[in-house]
UniProtKB/Swiss-Prot annotation:
GO terms for biological process: mitochondrial electron transport, NADH to ubiquinone; mitochondrial respiratory chain complex I assembly. One of its GO terms (molecular function) is NADH dehydrogenase (ubiquinone) activity. It comes from Zaedyus pichiy. Pfam families: NADHdh. It is found in: Mitochondrion inner membrane. This is NADH-ubiquinone oxidoreductase chain 1. Core subunit of respiratory chain NADH dehydrogenase (Complex I) which is composed of 45 different subunits. The gene is MT-ND1. Core subunit of the mitochondrial membrane respiratory chain NADH dehydrogenase (Complex I) which catalyzes electron transfer from NADH through the respiratory chain, using ubiquinone as an electron acceptor. Essential for the catalytic activity and assembly of complex I.
Length: 318
């Protein structure tokens, strides 16, 4: 039965991830005044399936001087972690209702750094290594603000369990009282998932393709799948934290529809940003975090910690 639950979680995520690649190519196509994929199947709907078949039947080549174990392990770890992050997500019921769901998500997203570092180092290529070092520095840096923003939200929520956020947001979405944090959170999720305008890890003009430059076929597909699964996961988390859907226990389907709609809108904004903005310079990327976001989030976190103490009260549902 538990295996069935896992399959019911994993299969829709994989389908969503596959069609997100198609939606992205279509949106970018229309924003650049062209059609996008439209050959395979009606309106190009079977393109993701064709891509998957093509990638997984190709021979997985690797550089002669690369470390075989790490080279294979890195994409597998990246994809496994991307799927594991969904375990505590309330949709409306999570796979395992963890008491410290937020901490679990933070810990696993930090582990994703290892897969990037291993892939860059094991490839034995200077481009891959520089791309990996950039990606690691960027991911670790932006995780600092994500953690502080999460702490502020949890102060409003009163617990580290994600499912209680629906109760907290019954009367008002947290995006309204916490809008500066919500804006910084959204920009940080763009940087965390290595998306434009923060896609410095794959600067084509200087690094060819970043840390996965030596990968081909199946392992490359795993990295690609991990990236898009992470994008959907981050947007689902944003929807849960700041745009909580109303949960009526008699009609749990309404929660799911509401939740998916918000996640889709946020994902569309990700794609819109990618089509609209040029890439940041590396020093600008780091200045934005360490000189703008970090002082602001720390100040706002102190404010949210002091509010319950000053009002001698506790957060809503405790």
């Amino acid at each position: 039965m538990f295996l069935m639950n896992i399959l019911c979680l994993v299969i829709p995520i994989l389908l969503a991830m596959a069609f997100l690649t198609l939606v992205e190519r279509k949106i970018l196509g229309y924003m650049q005044l062209r059609k996008g994929p439209n050959i395979v199947g009606p309106y190009g709907l079977l393109q993701p399936i064709a891509d998957a078949i093509k990638l997984f039947i190709k021979e997985p080549l690797r550089p002669l001087t690369s470390s075989k174990l790490m080279f294979t392990l890195a994409p597998t770890l990246a994809f496994t972690l991307a799927l594991s992050l969904w375990i505590p997500m309330p949709m409306p019921h999570s796979l395992i209702n963890l008491n410290l769901g937020v901490l679990f998500i933070l810990a696993l997203s930090s582990l994703a750094v290892y897969s990037i570092l291993w892939s860059g180092w094991a490839s034995n290529s200077k481009y891959a290594l520089i791309g990996a070092l950039r990606a690691v520095a960027q991911t670790i840096s932006y995780e600092v603000t994500l953690a502080i923003i999460l702490l502020s939200v949890m102060m409003m929520n009163g617990s580290f369990t994600l499912s209680t956020l629906t109760t907290t947001q019954e009367h008002m979405w947290l995006i309204l009282p916490l809008w500066p944090l919500a804006m910084m959170w959204f920009i940080s999720t763009l940087a965390e998932t290595n998306r434009a305008p923060f896609d410095l890890t794959e600067g084509e003009s200087e690094l060819v393709s970043g840390f996965n430059v030596e990968y081909a076929a199946g392992p490359f597909a795993l990295f690609f799948m991990a990236e898009y699964t992470n994008i959907i996961m981050m947007n689902a988390l944003t929807a849960t934290l700041f745009l909580g859907a109303f949960h009526n226990p008699l009609f749990p389907e309404l929660f799911t529809v509401n939740f998916i709609t918000k996640t889709l809108i946020l994902t569309a904004i990700f794609l819109w940003v990618r089509a609209s903005y040029p890439r940041f310079r590396y020093d600008q990327l780091m200045h934005l975090l360490w000189k703008s976001f970090l002082p602001l989030t720390l100040a706002l976190c102190m404010l949210h910690v002091s509010i319950p103490a000053l009002s001698a009260g506790v957060p809503p549902h405790m």
